[in-house]
């Protein structure tokens, strides 16, 4: 099994390190043709407008949508969730539009208002998961086929739709590998 981490911008290294701790072969994906070399893909946190601009400049956006629509398992964190969303509230931004959610960018505040909390994620075990929110998006609406796996303050923060796992916080910034392990089970 080889897992790609989209390497255009953001928390690339942190996701690669988490995967290495789990003994998984990784590929930092920087070219459209590399999307065919991976069994699953992580879209890291970062800056979503920069990420989509780079994807378009590299002609990778359409290939990525095609691969996701054909079943490529994807794990998106923070800005990656914005990239995948079908709708972005109060903001005009290009997106991939493959996940049936509406998001609000930077909903929990600016960088200085970043915070940590614990969330319950029954799908990965009974122990609470340390969730780090940094300029995180808020999922304000989910489609009928979107499964909510975790919430914070009544808002979904971890959702799954088919082959897509989307997390508004940053699990790669913790030592807890349960969400990465959960994604690997989706890939198998």
Swiss-Prot record:
Part of which pathway? Cofactor biosynthesis; pyridoxal 5'-phosphate biosynthesis
Record carries keyword Hydrolase: yes
Could you list this entry's UniProt keywords, alphabetically sorted.
Answer: Glutamine amidotransferase, Hydrolase, Lyase, Pyridoxal phosphate
The record lists the catalysed reaction(s) as: aldehydo-D-ribose 5-phosphate + D-glyceraldehyde 3-phosphate + L-glutamine = pyridoxal 5'-phosphate + L-glutamate + phosphate + 3 H2O + H(+); L-glutamine + H2O = L-glutamate + NH4(+)
Say if the entry is tagged with keyword Lyase: yes
Cellular component, GO, one term = cytosol
Q: Which residues form the active site?
A: 78, 170, 172
Task: Give me the residues that bind L-glutamine, please.
Answer: 46-48, 105, 134-135
Q: Subunit structure of this entry?
A: In the presence of PdxS, forms a dodecamer of heterodimers. Only shows activity in the heterodimer.
Give the family per the record: Belongs to the glutaminase PdxT/SNO family.
User: This protein is called what?
Assistant: Pyridoxal 5'-phosphate synthase subunit PdxT
- What organism, scientifically named, is this protein from? Thermotoga sp. (strain RQ2)
